[in-house]
Every structure is written in C-alpha cells, then in structure tokens.
C-alpha cells in the first residue's frame, strides 16, 4: 500500500463484525487518511458452516432444510436451485400448476428480500422513518408465506417434481388483494424517498461501476443491471414458466448507488405484475386440493390431467443422481445463484459447488470505497445487498 503524499499518519479502523450497519458478521479493516478511505480489506468466514461438504453426505430431500440457511431472507430461491438440478439430471417433468405456484412464491420472496434490503439501507444513510412502513409490507408477505407453507421463513416448500402442498382455500384472493395494495405503497416509497434531496445527496454519484467493469468483476443481479447491462436469467434461461408472462427487465445506466436503488424498487413492481398474471392464469383455478379431486375419476376425469396435478410422481428418498455434471442457475434477488452439481450414480451428490451472488458482488467493495469518505462505506456496502449466510456458506 502506497503512503499518501500528505505525510499524515494513517489510522487503521476495525468496522465489524459487530457493527450495526454490517448486515451480519462482516469485518472491514479500513485504512484512513483523515476522513478519506485509503484502503479497505473485507474479512470473511465468521458464518462459515461447511454447506458444500454437508451436501455431499445428504440425499437431496434431506439437504433441502439446510439450503434455506444460505440466504435466509430469500429462501425460496435456494430451494428452487436445489430441486432444479436433480430435476434436470433426472429429466423430471414439473406440472404447470406447480410451476406457476413456484413462480408466485419466488416473486413474493424477491419482494420480501428487496423490502428487507430497502429498510436497513435507508436506516444506514440516516432515514429511519421508511423502515417502519417497509417492515409493515414485509409482514404481509410473510403472512402469505405462513398460510401457504406453515413457516414465515425457512419454508422447506419446494420438492423434486413439484411442491410440498397445494395453496390453501382463499389464499389466491388474499394474494391478489396484497398485490393491489402493494402497488400503491411503492408509489408512496417513491414520494417519500426517491425525490428526497438529502437522500439524493447521499447516494448520487457514490460507488459508480461501469458496464465493462461490472462484467470483469463477475457481478450479477441489480449490481449488473444498474450499470447499463439488461441481463436477467428469467428472460435468458426461461426456467420455470417465466416466458409465459409479460414483464420487462429493469435497468439503469448510471451505475451508482441511486441506480441500484431504482433497479430494486422497479423490480418489485415487475414482480407484482408476474404474480398477478400467474394467479389469474393458474392451471386448475383456485381450488384447494386437486390431488384428492384426481382420485374421483368417474365424476371429474379432467382433474387427472397432468397439468392440473399440483405435484408430479414423487421420486423415492433414495432418488439416484445420474453420473454427469450440471450447472444450474436462477435469478435470485441479489444476483445469479448457481449450483455446479456432479452426480455419481448414488443418492448423494459427489460435488455440490455453490455460486453465491453476494460473495462475488462483495469482491468489488475495496475498489469502490477507495478515495471515498468514511461515511460512504455504509452507503456503498448497503447498495451491494449482502447476506453473510450466503457469503460464508
């Protein structure tokens, strides 16, 4: 590290791992010249639990409850990636009803994750008021999750070939009501936050990342889309049934903290659009127990159609992963969440490599905070959106 020409003594400051703005057990060793950041070194690993090694000693159905502990604020995505890999290896078809319900759950999870990013991000830069409004909306999402899965967080809802249970009676109407209500709340956030001159002063031009730089660092998700690159795996990979809905990729050109905020805010409205279309076009309609209707062959033969069944033929707990390699990925709220899976003709995966978006997005932090003020570290770190459970695994 070069000594600045000012000749002043440098000060080394420890931020974290118990700092309230650290969003988990992240530690930063920051070298300061007065208020200016000269160098920053992130120290990781405080929350490492060996998730990749645990996967090698568990069948997929046993491993599902573990994966919700990676990104514990967007657990549906970790579940989706865990079942998508074996489904592709085993060529297992998912009924359209299950696929639609998965999309609804994924997008609700995206909204919950973005809300839980927005509240603390605003608190980090000195705006406490929106925090309480934002958490009120997040509670509504968790109420919907609790009604459908039995758990507010750590849902354990996805299964190989479908989902664990059908939607309960009245859930679809509740979810549609939430969608209508939430759209008005997003407008309120924009009035309260987006045009606030103090907020703009803190985020505009702070932590700028160019498009080419974002690609070179391997960034993904809102970090990449805020730098002028409209890349979204839901459009590119067309997994689940995303290509059956009308929605737009949200992106910005500026590449600063404000652009990342705007991308996430507009992504929430796009998620609502997708949820509304999925609820209205749900195969089988708003009935609550299609599986039992399927047994009633004489009276209702149409319920036996594959697309109406909410779950396909269940694979056995000793479902074997064929001997091949596979990389699967989904567009999680924080970026590209991927799994490199190697099967070995046994019930356990031979290798289970996790590609966490937060870990890779965090690598650019030292580059962004250099030559910035100490107070800007919290703004930049908050705009990256990390969860340490996913970073350390």
From Swiss-Prot:
Gene3D superfamilies: Cytochrome-c3 Hydrogenase, chain B (1.10.645.10). GO terms for cellular component: chloroplast; chloroplast stroma; chloroplast thylakoid; chloroplast thylakoid membrane. Signal peptide: none annotated. Its EC number is 7.1.1.-. One of its GO terms (molecular function) is oxidoreductase activity, acting on NAD(P)H, quinone or similar compound as acceptor. It catalyses: a plastoquinone + NADH + (n+1) H(+)(in) = a plastoquinol + NAD(+) + n H(+)(out); a plastoquinone + NADPH + (n+1) H(+)(in) = a plastoquinol + NADP(+) + n H(+)(out). It is a peripheral membrane protein. It is found in: Plastid, Chloroplast thylakoid membrane. Its main location: plastid. It comes from the Eukaryota. Keywords: Chloroplast, Membrane, NAD, NADP, Plastid, Plastoquinone, Quinone, Thylakoid, Translocase, Transport. NDH is composed of at least 16 different subunits, 5 of which are encoded in the nucleus. Interacts with the chaperonin CNP60B4 subunit. Folded specifically by a chaperonin Cpn60 complex containing at least 1 Cpn60 beta 4 subunit. Belongs to the complex I 49 kDa subunit family. NCBIfam families: PRK06075.1, PRK07415.1. NDH shuttles electrons from NAD(P)H:plastoquinone, via FMN and iron-sulfur (Fe-S) centers, to quinones in the photosynthetic chain and possibly in a chloroplast respiratory chain. The immediate electron acceptor for the enzyme in this species is believed to be plastoquinone. Couples the redox reaction to proton translocation, and thus conserves the redox energy in a proton gradient. This is NAD(P)H-quinone oxidoreductase subunit H, chloroplastic. It comes from Arabidopsis thaliana (Mouse-ear cress).
């Amino acid at each position: 590290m070069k000594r600045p020409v000012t000749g002043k003594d440098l000060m080394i400051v420890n931020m974290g791992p118990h700092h309230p703005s650290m969003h988990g057990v992240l530690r930063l060793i920051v070298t300061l010249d007065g208020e200016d950041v000269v160098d920053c070194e992130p120290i990781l690993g405080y929350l490492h639990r060996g998730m990749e090694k645990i996967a090698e000693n568990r069948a997929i159905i046993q491993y599902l409850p573990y994966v919700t502990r990676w990104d514990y604020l967007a657990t549906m995505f970790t579940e989706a990636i865990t079942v998508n890999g074996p489904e592709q290896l085993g060529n297992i078809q998912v009924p359209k009803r299950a696929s639609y319900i998965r999309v609804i759950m994924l997008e609700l999870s995206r909204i919950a994750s973005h809300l839980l990013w927005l509240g603390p991000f605003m608190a980090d830069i000195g705006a406490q008021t929106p925090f309480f409004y934002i958490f009120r909306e997040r509670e509504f999402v968790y109420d919907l999750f609790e009604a459908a899965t039995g758990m507010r967080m750590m849902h354990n809802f996805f299964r190989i070939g479908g989902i664990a249970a059908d939607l309960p009676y009245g859930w679809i109407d509740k979810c549609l009501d939430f969608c209508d209500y939430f759209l008005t709340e997003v407008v309120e956030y924009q009035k309260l936050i987006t045009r606030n001159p103090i907020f703009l002063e803190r985020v505009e031009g702070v932590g700028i990342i160019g498009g080419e730089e974002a690609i070179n660092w391997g960034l993904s998700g809102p970090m990449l889309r805020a730098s002028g690159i409209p890349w979204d795996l839901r459009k590119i990979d067309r997994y689940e049934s995303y290509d059956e809905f009308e929605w737009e990729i949200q992106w910005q050109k500026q590449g600063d903290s404000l652009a990342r905020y705007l991308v996430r805010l507009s992504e929430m409205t796009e998620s609502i659009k997708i949820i509304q279309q999925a609820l209205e076009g749900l195969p089988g309609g708003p009935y609550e127990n299609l599986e039992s209707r399927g047994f009633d062959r004489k009276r209702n033969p149409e319920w036996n159609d594959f697309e109406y069944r909410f779950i396909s033929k269940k694979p056995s707990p000793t479902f074997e992963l064929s001997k091949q390699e596979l990389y699967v990925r989904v567009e999680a709220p924080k970026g590209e969440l991927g799994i490199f899976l190697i099967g070995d003709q046994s019930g356990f995966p031979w290798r289970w490599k996790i590609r966490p978006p937060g870990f890779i997005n965090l690598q650019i932090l030292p580059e962004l905070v250099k030559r910035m003020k100490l107070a800007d570290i919290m703004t930049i770190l908050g705009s990256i959106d990390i969860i340490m459970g996913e970073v350390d695994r």
